Structure formats: structure tokens, C-alpha cells
């Protein structure tokens, strides 16, 4: 892959993917969601990228309302996962994204063989036909026009840059009262570096599939929670998901869960931003 567009380039997964692809020599159009308050960590992320001639940062509002350059074989990643976890889905401006970008550029996507990949929370599958029908309808239209659209449904992702909304982050940051967010999926977990390697390796051969990504380690979230001495309910049942619409793919764990968590701890300690983590 020579070039990618990452919508949500400063979100947890979007940024981790952006940094990895830049290290691979890929050219990146990094689109960052404009929010009422800019996260203090965004500047830290800019510093982590540094002066890179292959990185072009763009504001979401300006980008979605302007004439965008779409290049042959572009891969477009749209990170919705983080917005869901942080309860900031309004920042996506779904109607504009669909009408002003996805549908408006349909012919161009087809002619230029563009591939699109959505990064979504696993909870999206709980009521895929009703709650998220507008986006699902747009995806169906794109696929009907032979445009490659892949959807990756993700459990808890952990590691460096994980947002403070996650219980793992809170425990590692020594927050006294750790709260398990109702939007946190406690039935599985994947280490960020393993997810990014998977996304990077499959980006050139995206087949327009819908995939539920799962860890190769059974009870991965629970193992992490026990390592961090989190208090959680063992009796929480995994909700029914619309699995009939997706392919399940196991992500191989490259490091022991404890090593992944300690990497996250070291990263938290390396960044000192009041209220920024």
C-alpha cells in the first residue's frame, strides 16, 4: 500500500495505524475529527509523528466539505470505534459522511478501485439492522456498485494510547475508583500492536468482508482484568450478536497479555499531561 486516508487519525486505533503506516513509508492523509475541546494528547501525538513529509493533517469539517483528492488504489480507513467508546458519535456527522463523501464519490471510488475499511465496536453487531441502518444502507449501496468495503468489528483494544474511558487504562494510571464503562466489551480483548499488524497486512488485499476480530487467547479480557486486580462480574453473559452476517477471524497474540499491559503502563508514565489521559 502506497497511500491511505485515515479518518480519525488522532483517535486510539486511527493514530496507532497512522504511525505504523508512516513507518512503513506510506503516504497518509490524516483526517482528525473536530470536537468542541481538542484533546491535550493530540499535540503529543503530533510530536510522536514528528516532521514527516508523508503526513498531511486535515480538519474533518474542511475535508468533508471540500473537493477531496482521491487517488487510484487509495485505502480509506474510517475509525468509528473510538467515537463509540467515548460516546462522541456526533463528531462523525454521519449524514454528511454518507451523503457528501461516500455516496457523492461512488463513481470515483469505483473507477479508481478505492478500498474502504470501517473500524467499528463489536457492539455494532447487537442491532445492526435498526440502530445503525443509515450507515449499513450506505455500505450496501457501495458494495452493490462493486466497491470494496470491509467492516472490522472489534472487542476491547488495549496498549499505548488507550483512552481513559477503558478500565485497563484507569487501573494502570492508578486511578482510585476504576469504572468499567458500559460501552466496554468485557468478553474479549486484543493488543493494539497485533491489531495494527493485521490491518496493515490485509490492507492491500481487502476483500470487502465483514469480520468479527477475536483474540487467539481464550478469556483475554478476563486475564488482563485479573492481572490488574479489577473487580468485575464473572456472571456477565456475552450478548447475542448478529454473527450470521460476519466472518470470525482470530488475531494471533504476539506478546503475553501482561507484557502488553506493562507496555501501556510505561507509556502512561512517559506522558505527563494533567487530565489528558
Regions found by a protein language model. Name each.
Residues 198-277:
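Mid/C-terminal beta-alpha module of Rossmann-like enzyme folds, strongest
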Residues 74-89, 94-133:
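Conserved Rossmann-fold NAD(P)-dependent oxidoreductase catalytic core, especially the SDR/UDP-sugar
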Residues 1-70, 250:
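N-terminal Rossmann/SDR dinucleotide-binding element
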Residues 131-196:
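NAD(P)-dependent short-chain dehydrogenase/reductase
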Residues 11-13, 34-37, 63, 82-87, ...:
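Short acidic, S/G/P-rich loop/turn micro-motifs used as interaction or catalytic elements
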Residues 28, 149, 210:
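Hydrophobic anchor at the start of a short beta-strand
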Amino acid at each position: 500500500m502506497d497511500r491511505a486516508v485515515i479518518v480519525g487519525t488522532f483517535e486510539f486505533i486511527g493514530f496507532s495505524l497512522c504511525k505504523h503506516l508512516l513507518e512503513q513509508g506510506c503516504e497518509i492523509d490524516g483526517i482528525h475529527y473536530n470536537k468542541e475541546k481538542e484533546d491535550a494528547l493530540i499535540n503529543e501525538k503530533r510530536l510522536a509523528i514528528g516532521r514527516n513529509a508523508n503526513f498531511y493533517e486535515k480538519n474533518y469539517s474542511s475535508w468533508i466539505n471540500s473537493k477531496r483528492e482521491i487517488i487510484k488504489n487509495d485505502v480509506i480507513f474510517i475509525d468509528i470505534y473510538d467515537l463509540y467508546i467515548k460516546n462522541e458519535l456526533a463528531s462523525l456527522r454521519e449524514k454528511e459522511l454518507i451523503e457528501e463523501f461516500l455516496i457523492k464519490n461512488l463513481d470515483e471510488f469505483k473507477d479508481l478501485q478505492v478500498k474502504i475499511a470501517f473500524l467499528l465496536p463489536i457492539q455494532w453487531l447487537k442491532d445492526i439492522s435498526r440502530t445503525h441502518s443509515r450507515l449499513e444502507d450506505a455500505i450496501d449501496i457501495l458494495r452493490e456498485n462493486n466497491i470494496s468495503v470491509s467492516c472490522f468489528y472489534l472487542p476491547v483494544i488495549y496498549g499505548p494510547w488507550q483512552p481513559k474511558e477503558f478500565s485497563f487504562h484507569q487501573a494502570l494510571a492508578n486511578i482510585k475508583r476504576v469504572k468499567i464503562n458500559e460501552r466496554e466489551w468485557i468478553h474479549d480483548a486484543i493488543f493494539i500492536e497485533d491489531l495494527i499488524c493485521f490491518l496493515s497486512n490485509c490492507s492491500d488485499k481487502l476483500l470487502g468482508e465483514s469480520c468479527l476480530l477475536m483474540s487467539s487467547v481464550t478469556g483475554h479480557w478476563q486475564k488482563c482484568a485479573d492481572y490488574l486486580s479489577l473487580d468485575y462480574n464473572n456472571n456477565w453473559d456475552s450478548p447475542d450478536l448478529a454473527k450470521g452476517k460476519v466472518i470470525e477471524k482470530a488475531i494471533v497474540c504476539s506478546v503475553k497479555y501482561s507484557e502488553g499491559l506493562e507496555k501501556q503502563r510505561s507509556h502512561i508514565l512517559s506522558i505527563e499531561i494533567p487530565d489528558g489521559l
